[in-house]
From Swiss-Prot:
Protein name per Swiss-Prot or TrEMBL: Pyrimidine-nucleoside phosphorylase
Pfam families, A to Z: Glycos_trans_3N (PF02885), Glycos_transf_3 (PF00591), PYNP_C (PF07831)
Keywords assigned: Glycosyltransferase, Metal-binding, Potassium, Transferase
Encoding gene, per UniProt annotation: pdp
Keyword Glycosyltransferase: yes
Length: 433
């Protein structure tokens, strides 16, 4: 088999066989296929697309390129949730203990964040002593004992994807549905999930800005999952404005605690209940979405979900007293109010710009080496569709420096007030095939 033949075949719009895809992935992973041929094939895929069989073969070749996490010793159906990312996306922090409280095993592998705010691990590390560097054996035991644990991304999972991702980044082939879908799904499958719930974001703060693109990606990932024997479904949710009210690590953790107590923002609570219901049904802990939703609402009302979160924190060395005393979490020196310049309705809060402002405060990383300031960030007091009066506080900036003119300027250009406005739809579609 020759790489040039595979490139020409795809360039001409023909379908590649499983063997041809495996030949490319194995060769590229081991350095036998040079970057220039890999980038040529990536560009051919970008223009000619791939059918469902090719996408599944590419995904599984990437899964098989490295180590796989074996979660078979964990009792029950392991359901993993993946979000395509956004601003103020606190869902994992609420969802993991919530679904665990009704018997869904959550064996979560999480990373650190690059960009607007930290990843799930950065947020959890706002809790003094919390440790994700645990052995696979301890990880499995924690999930069997308490239904929920989080481990740092470890081992050599999907090396082919890491290599191909870096190449796509510099060759103009990032925005290709088959390449994005296989990249995301290979990581989830290698991490040992039996079933997968996807939260595909759309809007200004999302990777997929339009609903059509988000839908195409959701269908692609769901089909890959179902084709390789993993029950998969997707929800398309709005990210035109930040999710919830908090953007920043400790601030988002405080918001997660409030949500587990039943006092969280409406949109975050609704998204968590929607995603959680799907997870509970896929884990076969309920027979209908309505039954699953009621189980989750009860777990919040009775305090079961909150207790699960406490045990989860203390099991991994974290100080669980922060659940009852969130003021113990890292906080910023100064709080600066950002006030409305006129009366009206908020029609726009550009999610990614708010995210960038939060990163400028120190809540996120621009490079891998950056140190995150866990206490800083932004808390929205108003959301799109809500009425404000001139001089009313729209958001509060939590900062450790008074030099924030550039951030105020950015916020000024990210929020629009007009004479009428309405709240965006939170959940656009549910995709099961």
């Amino acid at each position: 088999m020759r790489m040039i033949d595979i490139i020409e075949k795809k360039r001409d719009g023909k379908s590649l066989t499983k063997e041809e895809i495996e030949f490319f992935v194995n060769g590229y992973t081991h350095g036998e296929v040079p970057d220039y041929q890999a980038s040529s094939l990536a560009m051919a895929i970008f223009f000619q697309d791939m059918n469902d069989e090719e996408r599944a073969a590419l995904t599984m070749s990437m899964v098989n390129s490295g180590e796989k996490i074996d979660l078979s010793d964990i009792n029950g159906i392991k359901v993993d949730k993946h979000s395509t990312g956004g601003v103020g996306d606190t869902t994992t922090l609420v969802l993991a203990p919530l679904v665990a409280a009704v018997g869904v095993p959550v064996a979560k592998m999480s990373g650190r964040g690059l960009g607007h705010t930290g990843g799930t691990i950065d947020k959890l590390e706002s809790v003094k002593g919390f440790n994700v560097e645990i052995s696979e054996k301890d990880f499995i035991k924690l999930v069997n004992d308490n239904q929920v644990a989080v481990i740092g991304q470890s081992g050599n999972l999907t090396p082919a994807d890491k290599k191909l991702y870096a190449l796509r980044d510099v060759t103009g082939t990032v925005n290709s549905i088959p390449l994005i879908a296989s990249s995301i799904m290979s990581k989830k499958i290698a991490a040992g999930a039996d079933a997968i719930v996807l939260d595909v974001k759309t809007g200004s703060g999302a990777f997929m800005k339009t609903l059509d693109d988000a839908e195409a990606l959701a269908h692609a990932m769901v089909r890959i999952g179902n084709n390789v024997g993993r029950n998969t479904m997707a929800i398309i949710s709005d990210m035109s404005q930040p999710l919830g009210n908090a953007i920043g690590n400790a601030l988002e953790l405080k918001e997660a605690i409030a949500t587990l107590k039943g006092n969280g923002p409406k949109d975050l609570t609704e998204l968590v209940l929607t995603l959680g219901s799907q997870m509970v049904v896929l884990a076969e802990q309920a027979t209908s979405l309505d039954e699953a939703r009621q189980m989750l609402i009860d777990a919040i009302k009775t305090g079961k979900a909150l207790n699960k979160f406490k045990t989860f924190l203390s099991n991994q060395g974290g100080d669980d007293s922060i659940v009852d005393s969130p003021e113990k979490l890292p906080s910023a020196k100064y709080q600066v109010e950002f006030k409305a310049k006129k009366d009206g309705y908020i029609t726009e809060i550009i999610a990614n710009e708010i995210g960038v402002a939060s990163m400028m405060l120190g809540a996120g990383r621009q490079t891998k080496e950056d140190v995150i300031d866990l206490g800083v960030g932004i808390v929205l007091n108003k959301k799109v569709g809500e009425h404000v009066e001139k001089g009313e506080n729209i958001l509060t900036i939590h900062t450790n420096t008074k030099e924030i003119d550039d951030i105020l300027y950015k916020l000024d250009n990210s929020i629009t007030i007009e004479s009428k406005g309405e709240a965006p739809t939170l959940i656009h579609k549910i995709i099961t095939e």
